[in-house]
Design a protein with these regions (language model features):
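Short, strongly hydrophobic alpha-helical membrane anchors
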Residues: 1-3, 10, 16-36
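Serine residues within intrinsically disordered or low-complexity segments
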Residues: 6-12, 255-259
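Alpha-helical membrane segments of multi-pass proteins
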Residues: 23-327
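Hydrophobic residues within membrane-embedded alpha helices
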Residues: 3-6, 111
């Protein structure tokens, strides 16, 4: 039915409902890839082993470390949340979906490199930092790669380079290059966050004001990569459009035997929006997650700095003669 030039035979809410219904049906199709591809049990065991080691170190083995004190519940929450998020995006279905839907891939990247590293760094107690940085090799690595300018340009440069179509497609289809590149990116992300969040006085290379500028610079440097994806008017990545490239990429997360038994020739069976729109959505997701996390950290640094300044003012006031102190 047409009224005033508009088709009201299928209201917009009905079409949205059908789209979500379609997503639900298509998500059920993921089970054809099997439990191993969906939940990565080996990676799950690895994450569990890290958590167990963490709780052993801060618990019964804490006395083996010099000047070790009880770890706060807030720190435990930060570290545990970081590990859980890392498994959810890298070991859970999101990783598999990210090989089929680009927006899921960008969500995975945003969480893994922007949200997880600060949580892990905030969850490590000072005395454990002291132990880790007591090794000469660690000191050399941190002093070079965690220099603010180097860390700033290395992470953002690698992230942008990784998402160049020719690089992205090559890495996504390589059993060797893919895990290596992801590991390098994660290391670069940890080094990028180090100047902001490490609690050791000897590694405080940025003042609080410079930390705010550092985060703003990070946001600016990540923008070109997001803009390239958001404003592209054609598909950029063959691994999401070309059947042969997609099948090759899927071998990275789906057992070869399972993949060969499936009657699937491309990612279209799970697409619930046009490829270009999915691509643009991915860029927007990355930018939104980045703004939320960076904004939160900027707020954290600002209020921490303001609180320290107030305490300093109180100390200076107490040093004045009584008749000069304001009541």
């Amino acid at each position: 039915m047409i009224v005033g030039g508009s088709d009201i035979s299928k209201p917009s809410f009905y079409m949205k409902y059908k789209n979500f219904e379609k997503v639900g049906v298509e998500m059920e199709n993921l089970w054809v890839f099997g439990f191993q591809a969906l939940w990565s049990p080996i990676f799950l065991l690895f994450m569990i082993s890290i958590l167990i080691s963490y709780f052993l170190i801060i618990g019964p083995y804490r006395t083996r470390f010099e000047n070790a004190t009880k770890v706060s519940k807030k720190q435990i929450f930060y570290f545990t949340t970081g590990i859980v998020l890392l498994y959810v995006v890298k070991g859970g279905p999101i990783d598999l979906i990210g090989h089929i839907i680009f927006s899921a891939h960008m969500f995975e990247m945003a969480v893994m490199y922007i949200a997880v590293p600060p949580l892990l760094l905030l969850g490590i107690p000072v005395w454990l930092y002291c132990y880790i940085t007591s090794f000469k090799f660690v000191q050399i690595v941190i002093k070079f790669f965690a220099k603010p300018l180097i860390a700033l340009f290395v992470f953002n440069g690698l992230f942008s380079f990784y998402h160049l179509p020719i690089v992205f497609d090559a890495v996504k289809q390589s059993q060797i290059a893919h895990p290596i590149c992801l590991a390098i990116l994660f290391f670069a992300a940890m080094m990028m966050w180090w100047p902001m969040l490490n609690p050791l006085p000897e590694y405080q290379t940025l003042s609080d004001i410079k930390k705010l500028g550092y985060m703003f610079a990070n946001g600016i440097l990540l923008t070109p990569a997001c803009a390239l994806i958001i404003f592209a008017t054609a598909p950029l990545f063959a691994t999401y459009t070309d059947s042969a490239a997609w099948m090759k990429a899927m071998e990275l997360c789906v057992p070869a035997g399972t993949l060969s038994d499936l009657n699937i020739t491309g990612p279209e069976f799970l697409h619930w929006m046009p490829v270009v729109q999915d691509q643009q959505t991915g860029g927007i997701i990355m930018k939104i997650v980045q703004e939320i996390v960076y904004g939160t950290i900027i707020g954290y640094v600002f209020f921490k700095w303001a609180r320290r300044e107030r305490e300093k003012d109180k100390e200076q006031l107490q040093e004045l003669p009584p008749y000069l102190q304001t009541k």
